[in-house]
Amino acid sequence: MKSFGMTDIGRKRKVNQDYLFFSDEPIGCFPNLYIVADGMGGHKAGDKASSYAVNRFVELAKKEKKELPFLVMERLLNEVNEAVYELSCKEEQYAGMGTTFVAATVVDKTAYIMNVGDSRLYYFDGKIRQV
């Protein structure tokens, strides 16, 4: 499998609030890991929220060694959500920040995907398909 990612600021925004992570190599218990986060437009510090959420998820994922990846995903997302919320409460410049979050891992030809918000995941097998 080959992975590819890119972001584009678009025509309306002055700050790119997108953040990507993708690895075809193992990250903790994940045989591979692909994440897209997009800070919520109009919310304060969306760029910080997206980068913080992705980096925190990867940091936590690296510590997971034994559990099945699809069992870990939801727990890690809940921990990341709590961490983003706590940061937004502690520091005034981050008050109200938020982000979308899409993560996927492929285990034995099965994709496990989680999605919070309106970011999209696409699958390509000769045709581009939105998941």
Q: How should these model regions be labeled?
A:
Residues 1-131:
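PP2C/PPM-type serine/threonine phosphatase catalytic domain
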